[in-house]
C-alpha cells in the first residue's frame, strides 16, 4: 500500500505557478512608474514557493549535508539529468528522511519528493527531468531531527515541458507499465553491509498536459507516474511522489545498503489510477 503522497498533485502545481504569476502582476501594478514592467526576481519566486510548499518552516543552508548536480546548459530540455546526493559527515547520527526536488520556473515546480526507508542507506538518487525555462533548481532535505536544509543549482534550458513525446500514443500504450530493474555490484559473501547501486525503469509517457499531438495539434492530457515505491524484500528503499516534471519513461538510479533479501519489488501508480508491479531476484546484471 502506498503512503499518503508527500508531493503536490499536478493540479496543485499549476495553482502554485498561477500564484507566482499573480505575484509578478502584483509587483508590476505597484511600480511607481507604470511604464516599467518588473518581473519578480528568482529569490522572490523561490521565497513564494518555499513558503507554500514548506508552510513557512525555516530552511537552513544544506551545503555539506546534501548536494545536487545538473548540467549548467542542458542538451535536451525534456531529459535533463539530475543527481541528488546525501553527504552527511561521518559520525552524524542523523539521516535524511526525505528529499524534495523543486524546479522553480516549471509549471508544476515540485518535480518529486523521495521518502527513504529507515535502513535503506540511500545516499544517491538520479533521474531525468523536464525544464521549461532558465531556472534555479532547489533540493530540500528533511532530516530525522525535523530540520530542513536546502541547496540549489542553476540550469539553462527551455521548452522541456511542452517538447513532443519521443513515442506516439499507440507505442506508449503498447508498452505502458513495462519495467526493468538492474543491480550493480555483487552483494554476496559479506557484501551485504556494503553500499550497492540499482536502477529501475518504467515505460510511461509521463505526459505533461502541455504537449501537443503532432497530427491533431490538440493538447495531450496529463498522464504521469504519481507514486512509485522500491522495496528490498519487505523493506522500503524509497518512495517517490512525482508529477509532470519527471521525464518520459521514468528512470531512477540509486544507492542502497544490501541486506541479503531475496527479491526486489517495484510498485507504481499513475494519475489515471493504473497500478503496475513487478519483482526480481536479488542478483546483479538483470
Regions picked out by a protein language model, each given a short descriptive name:
Residues 50-77, 171-192:
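N-terminal edge beta-strand
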Residues 117-125, 244-253:
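Aromatic sugar-binding surface patches on proteins
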Residues 128-134, 255-261:
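Surface-exposed, short loops/turns at beta-strand junctions within beta-sandwich domains
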Residues 143-150, 269-278:
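Short acidic/polar inter-strand loop motif in beta-rich domains
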Residues 69, 81-90, 197-205, 213-218:
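Short edge beta-strand/loop segments characteristic of extracellular beta-sandwich folds
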Residues 41-43, 159-181, 285-286:
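Low-complexity, Pro/Ser/Thr- and charge-rich linker/hinge segments at domain boundaries
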Amino acid at each position: 500500500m502506498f503512503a499518503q503522497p508527500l508531493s503536490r498533485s499536478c493540479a496543485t502545481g499549476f495553482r502554485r505557478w498561477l500564484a507566482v504569476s499573480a505575484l509578478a502582476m502584483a509587483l508590476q501594478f505597484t511600480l511607481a512608474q507604470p511604464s516599467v514592467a518588473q518581473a519578480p526576481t528568482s529569490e522572490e519566486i523561490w521565497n513564494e514557493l518555499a513558503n507554500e510548499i514548506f508552510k513557512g518552516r525555516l530552511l537552513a543552508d544544506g551545503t555539506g549535508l546534501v548536494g545536487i548536480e545538473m548540467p549548467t546548459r542542458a542538451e535536451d530540455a525534456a531529459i535533463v539529468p539530475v543527481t541528488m546526493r546525501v553527504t552527511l559527515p561521518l559520525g552524524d547520527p542523523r539521516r535524511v528522511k526525505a528529499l524534495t526536488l523543486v524546479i522553480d520556473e516549471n509549471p508544476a515546480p515540485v518535480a518529486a519528493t523521495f521518502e527513504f526507508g529507515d535502513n535503506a542507506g540511500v545516499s544517491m538518487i538520479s533521474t531525468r527531468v523536464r525544464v521549461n525555462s532558465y531556472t534555479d533548481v532547489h533540493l530540500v532535505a528533511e532530516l530525522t531531527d525535523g530540520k530542513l536544509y536546502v541547496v540549489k543549482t542553476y540550469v539553462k534550458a527551455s521548452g522541456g515541458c511542452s517538447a513532443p513525446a519521443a513515442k506516439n500514443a499507440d507505442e506508449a500504450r503498447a508498452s505502458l507499465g513495462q519495467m526493468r530493474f538492474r543491480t550493480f555490484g555483487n552483494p554476496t559473501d559479506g557484501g551485504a553491509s556494503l553500499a550497492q547501486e540499482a536502477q529501475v525503469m518504467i515505460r510511461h509517457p509521463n505526459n505533461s498536459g502541455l504537449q501537443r499531438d503532432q497530427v491533431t495539434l490538440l493538447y495531450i492530457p496529463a498522464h504521469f507516474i504519481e507514486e512509485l515505491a522500491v522495496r528490498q524484500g519487505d523493506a522500503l528503499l524509497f518512495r517517490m511522489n512525482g508529477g509532470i516534471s519527471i521525464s518520459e519513461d521514468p528512470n531512477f538510479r540509486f544507492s542502497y545498503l544490501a541486506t541479503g533479501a531475496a527479491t526486489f519489488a517495484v510498485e507504481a501508480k499513475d494519475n489515471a489510477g493504473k497500478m503496475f508491479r513487478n519483482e526480481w531476484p536479488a542478483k546483479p546484471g538483470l
